[in-house]
Structures are given as structure tokens and as C-alpha cells.
Amino acid sequence: NKGVELSLSTINVKTRDFTWQTDWTFSTNSEKIKELANGSMQDTSGPWFVGHPINIFWDYKYDRIWQDTLEDNKMMQLYQKIGNLTFLPGQYKICDQPLEEVPEGTEGSKTVILDDGTKVSYMDNGFGRFTDDDKVIYNKSPKWTGGLNNSFTYKDWNFSFFTYFRFGNTYYGLSQTIGRRLEKDVWSPTNTNAKFAQPTTATRTSTYDGARNYTKGNMVLVRNIALSYTVPQKFLNKYGI
């Protein structure tokens, strides 16, 4: 576990009545598992992997939305024939091993017959079914965080605000697929570049839809906005305060 923390204060402008001061902070942290019990390189119950951080997600990766095209319909049939998986146009597609089509009879290949009688021979590299080999590692912790506080003082008035930065992490948000209000940008035959899947009650494989919920946690947030006034001491003295 290694990290760096830096802080810096600067006075950008200073006159008789006006001062602008900025306080900067920056931190980065890198953690990696060096070894696991019994010399293992991974423990999926954690999940923990040598060479990777402790605080991670280990899951499938969202690819795109299935389209109603010849190519995608062929792929969806292959998933049905190979892995008994039912996918539909307008639903979420998950990253898998690549489809490698080869001549029939190629060593290490398999052959399936599509509904129209077409034969498809492919390398048996894991395509068509989802296993641990298809999962990826998502880092929950940001690669770096930072902030800056700007303070502006004019005579007895002060205005300040704090800006927070965070980059390089992934979070899991259920609002992408569960409990979300009806979105306008959902897939349809006339809106094929939509961000969200088409609502449906059709029978399909939805086991892997959760992969859509992983989202980059990069953010810039302005908070702690404050405006204050300092009552002059002579005024307080005058009224005995």
C-alpha cells in the first residue's frame, strides 16, 4: 500500500481590501495484494487477486445493446444453440470471448446448425457461454482524489467554496436497471442508439443484466459554499457586545 498526499496554499491576489486565497489538496493511493494463502494467485470468494487491489468488483462487462440486424440475430441464435441463452434485440449484450469462425472439421472447433439450416463452425474458446474467464476486475477505490478551497475576502465580507475531485474508480449503481423511472432514451427499432434497454416481459436470459450497472465514478463536486460577514469590533464595542 503506497500513497502520496500533497497540500499547497497560495495567495493569488492581495490588495488593501481584497484577498483571494486557494488551498489545494491532492492524494493518490496504490494498493496491491502481494500473496495469498497456499501460494494461490486468486481467491474468487473474496474476490482477491495477486497484483490487484483488495477493494474490487469482479464481474461481467457490459458491451452494448443487441440490435435487430442479420449479424446480431445470427449471434443470438448461436448463444441459444451453444449455451441455451435467450437474448433479444433491444436488450443488454455482455462481453464474451470472440466468435472465431473456421472451416468445418478444424481441430478444436465445434459446429452448430442455425434455424435456416446454415452450418456455423467455430473455435471452442469459450464463446457462447459465460464463465469466470469472461469476468473483469473493477477498482472500487479512486486512483486519485483532490480538492481546492477558494476564499475571497473583501473588507468584512468573505465568500468561499470547496471543489472536490475524484477519478479512476467504478461504482455499482442499481438505478441503471432496477427501480428507475421510465426513460425516454430506451431502445426501439427507430432509436437503435439508445442508452437503455427496451422494457419487455418477453422470456429471455436476464442473468447478466447487472453488468450494465457498473459506472465510472469520476466526479467533480462543488460544495460547502459559504458567504459570511464579520461585524467590525468598533460596532460591537459601541453596543457593549
Summary of predicted features, one role per range:
Residues 4, 16, 156-161, 234-235:
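Repeated loop/turn-to-beta-strand initiation elements of outer-membrane beta-barrel proteins
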Residues 22-28, 152, 161-165, 189, ...:
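Transmembrane beta-barrel strands of outer-membrane/channel proteins
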Residues 4, 11-138:
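Conserved small-residue
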Residues 20-22, 148, 154, 159-161, ...:
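Transmembrane beta-strands of outer-membrane beta-barrel proteins
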Residues 166-241:
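Extracytoplasmic gating/loop element in the C-terminal half of outer-membrane beta-barrel translocons
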Residues 7-9, 127-136, 140, 195, ...:
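Extracytoplasmic loops and strand-loop junctions of Gram-negative outer membrane beta-barrel proteins
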Residues 2-8, 144-150, 222-227:
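Hydrophobic, lipid-facing positions within transmembrane beta-strands of outer-membrane proteins
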Residues 10-12, 26-32, 154-156, 165-169, ...:
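Transmembrane beta-strands of outer-membrane beta-barrel pores
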